[in-house]
Design a protein with these regions (language model features):
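Terminal membrane-proximal soluble interaction domains of membrane-associated proteins
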Residues: 1-62
Length: 62
């Protein structure tokens, strides 16, 4: 059981165009983005957790 929650951050392990893989909390999970694409190795933030995947966006530098 993968523990991923809204607000968690991770890093893309493949390009999201708009679907791909993201590493969050040490787990590789299927993710999608509402952006056009996010390249591999980019920090992302979890917006929504669904049954089979998560919705992410680029993490804004603070």
């Amino acid at each position: 059981d993968v523990s991923v929650e809204v607000g968690d951050t991770g890093v893309t392990s493949s390009r999201l165009a708009p679907m791909g893989k993201v590493k969050v909390n040490g787990h590789i999970v299927e993710a999608k983005t509402n952006d056009d694409f996010i390249d591999e190795g980019v920090e992302v933030k979890v917006l929504e957790v669904m049954n089979t995947n998560i919705l992410v966006e680029r993490k804004v530098k603070e």
